[in-house]
C-alpha cells in the first residue's frame, strides 16, 4: 500500500475530525481501515470483521467518510440528482443487517448534511445551520421512510434538551451528534458536550467527529 495515499486520505476533513475524537490506539485502527479500503474496497463485510463492536462501528463509519469524500457533489460528473442518490444510497448500504427504515434514513440524511457542510460556508451559526438544513428538493430526494425522520430533518437537535436524547438506533445517534455539533462553537467544545452526554458510544463520537471535521477542518 502506498503510504502517501494513506496520508492523503488521513488528511481529509472527515477523517481528521474522527482522529481528533479517538484515543491513540484507535487511530492506528482507523489507518488500517483506510489501507484496506484503498486496497480492496467493498470486499470485507462487517459481520466478518474481527474485533470489538467499537471496532466494527469505527470501520463502518470510516468507510462512510471515505465514500462521502469520493462522491461529494462538487466532484461528481453525474447530474446532480444522480450524484445525490449515489451519495445517499452508498451511505445507507453500509448498514448491512442494521437496515431498518429509520436507520436507512439516518445514513442518507447524514450523507447529505456532511456533503453540504463540506461545500458550504464557515465561521458562523448561520453557515452551520445552512449546512444542516435540507432544501425542499433535498428533502424530496431523501425520501424519508420512517415517521420519526421528519423531526430530525426539521431540526429536533436544536430544540431538545440533553436528557431527551438517546442512542437506540442510528437515527438517535445522528440526532445526538447533531445536538453536540449545534450547541458548540469549536470541535473541542463539542467534545466536552459529547463526554457529558454519550461519549462512551463510539457511533455518536465518530459521527460528531465527521460533522466537526466537515465544518471546522475543511480549510
Language-model regions, residue ranges each:
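Structured, active/binding-site neighborhoods that engage oxygen-rich ligands
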Residues: 1-219
Amino acid at each position: 500500500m502506498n503510504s502517501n495515499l494513506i496520508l492523503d486520505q488521513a488528511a481529509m476533513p472527515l477523517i481528521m475530525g474522527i482522529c481528533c475524537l479517538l484515543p491513540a490506539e484507535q487511530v492506528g485502527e482507523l489507518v488500517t481501515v483506510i489501507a484496506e479500503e484503498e486496497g480492496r474496497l467493498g470486499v470485507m463485510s462487517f459481520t466478518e470483521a474481527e474485533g470489538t463492536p467499537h471496532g466494527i462501528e469505527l470501520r463502518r463509519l470510516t468507510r462512510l467518510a471515505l465514500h462521502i469524500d469520493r462522491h461529494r457533489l462538487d466532484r461528481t460528473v453525474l447530474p446532480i440528482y444522480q450524484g445525490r442518490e449515489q451519495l445517499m444510497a452508498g451511505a445507507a448500504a453500509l448498514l448491512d443487517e442494521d437496515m431498518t427504515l429509520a436507520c436507512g434514513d439516518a445514513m442518507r440524511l447524514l450523507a447529505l448534511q456532511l456533503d453540504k457542510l463540506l461545500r458550504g460556508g464557515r465561521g458562523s451559526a448561520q453557515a452551520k445551520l445552512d449546512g444542516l438544513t435540507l432544501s425542499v428538493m433535498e428533502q424530496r430526494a431523501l425520501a424519508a421512510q420512517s415517521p420519526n425522520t421528519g423531526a430530525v430533518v426539521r431540526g429536533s437537535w436544536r430544540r431538545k434538551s440533553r436528557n431527551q436524547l438517546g442512542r437506540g438506533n442510528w437515527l438517535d445517534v445522528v440526532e445526538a451528534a447533531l445536538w453536540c455539533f449545534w450547541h458548540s462553537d469549536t470541535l473541542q467544545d463539542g467534545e466536552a458536550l459529547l463526554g457529558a452526554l454519550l461519549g462512551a458510544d463510539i457511533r455518536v463520537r465518530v459521527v460528531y467527529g465527521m460533522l466537526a471535521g466537515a465544518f471546522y477542518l475543511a480549510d
